[in-house]
Design a protein with these regions (language model features):
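Acidic, glycine-rich calcium-binding repeat modules characteristic of RTX/beta-roll
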Residues: 1-60
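Low-complexity acidic/polar repeat-biased segments
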Residues: 61-136
């Protein structure tokens, strides 16, 4: 299991995000066994985020937007919650001028992995429930 950590200050400026590529992101649920999956740790990067009841998405869709491009998943991040006015549908438009970090999961299609997840909120909830995402 690998934990990929982003800290406040790692991000780029709004509209010119820092871009990180992750290869071989293990998609198994994290914490289930010694060969559990990898984890994205954004708790120090995101400012003012909250998780909803029962590991719900809370306001995290204001911070995270997901897009599938070929066989990759692009995680667009606004560390200050700048996506609040967006539609929050996977692959829909988002406020690129607010993006400060982009995480590319190479060879991973999260929408296919979590079949039926068509909104950012649904993907976030799946990631939280599978211990794949750490936030405050």
């Amino acid at each position: 299991m690998d934990v990929f950590v982003w800290r406040l200050g790692d991000q780029g400026a709004a509209g010119t995000p820092a871009v990180d590529h992750i290869q071989n992101f293990a998609t198994a649920a994290a914490g289930t066994n010694a060969t559990g999956g990898d984890v994205l740790d954004l708790r120090d990067l995101l400012l003012g985020e909250s998780v909803g009841p029962s590991n719900g998405a809370g306001n995290l869709a204001d911070y995270l937007h997901f897009e599938v491009s070929g066989s990759d998943t692009l995680v667009h991040v606004s560390h200050t919650g700048g996506f609040a006015a967006d539609a929050h549908a996977v692959g829909a438009g988002y406020t690129a001028a607010q993006e400060t970090q982009q995480i590319i999961l190479e060879g991973v299609n999260l929408q296919s992995l979590y079949s039926g997840a068509t909104t950012d909120q649904q993907l976030i909830t799946q990631l939280l429930n599978n211990n794949k995402l750490i936030v405050d």
